[in-house]
Amino acid sequence: MILDESIQFGNKKLLLVLAVPESVCGNNKALTYSDLTTLVLKVSASWKSEDIALELPLHIDLEQIAYCISDNGSNLTCAFKSLNLKHIMDVNHQFSLIIKSVFENNVLFNNYTKALSLFRAQKSLSKIARIVSPNQRIMSRFMNFTPLFQWGIKMIILLDNNKLTQEEETALSFLKPYRSFIFDTYQILIRLNNMQKFLKNNGFSDKNAKEAMSLFSDMNSNNSLKIKEQLEAYFADLSSKTEDNKTICCSSDIIESCFSRYKAIVKGNKSVGISDLCLCIAAMLGENNLDKTRCAMETVKMKRLKEWNAKNISKTLFAEKKELNKILTEFIC
């Protein structure tokens, strides 16, 4: 089972719970929409652990749940704990936490990123703008800063081969003290990205963990050793939750993809908040989803849809504003 809550839409959040057959894990491919079944699609102003723990048993026999995949949100993890469910930490979020723990207070890293910010601010509109570094993420900055080091590698290669103008070489002179740090960090990030891709496609097992760790066999810098130590701890935790010779899924990327698809559909009118249009998520999941959706649209009555809406969506932000304006109109008139 995969769970997550959406980002804030207006004043509400959407809880999405997906069921995944164990048989589709470890088939040399990442999960797809056809592998999923929607269990819960419900809106609330907030989702506390108690709310989630009460909701899950209403939709599935807990004995059917082998494990739950999610990020490390306290509301989700506490809900799993109260229901005695195994929690598998999503590999993407876990790797992000590992990277953060190693680099957040690293002097070289902080000085390098500050230097890039200053360089970008000074040169983005100049005649040497072609060599300006990419923007840094503000939110979840440790989930993907590979582009910053990829850019650094490219600039060093151009400098080493005298392919830049004198002005560009002078502007990039600040990179010299970070040369070895850039190369080492880039190698760490490339290996982590490859490891993540391998685990998303092949799932986690003790055998796959050994193969994944082999990607770091030739790395022995201080930062890489710190990364390896935490990876081993993460894999040990997953191993303790995995039955012998079994492969489990360890990525919740697919649920993030569902939210992204929904956001793309409603992006033109976010002020409405979360409406029954979120049913588009359920419509795009499962096998033969097109035929099933067509059948549902032809057979489900509006009365039933309104009942579902009242129970799971309640009033949208747009409806609340409309109601308030109606009250205001009565006073003005």
Residue ranges and their predicted role:
Residues N105-L116:
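A catalytic-pocket lid/entrance helix-loop region that shapes and gates access to the active site
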Residues G73-S82, F95, R120-C333:
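Acidic/histidine-rich catalytic cores and adjacent linkers
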Residues M1-C68, S74, C78-H93, S101-V107, ...:
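RNase H-like nuclease fold core
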Residues I98:
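Conserved His + Asp/Glu catalytic blocks
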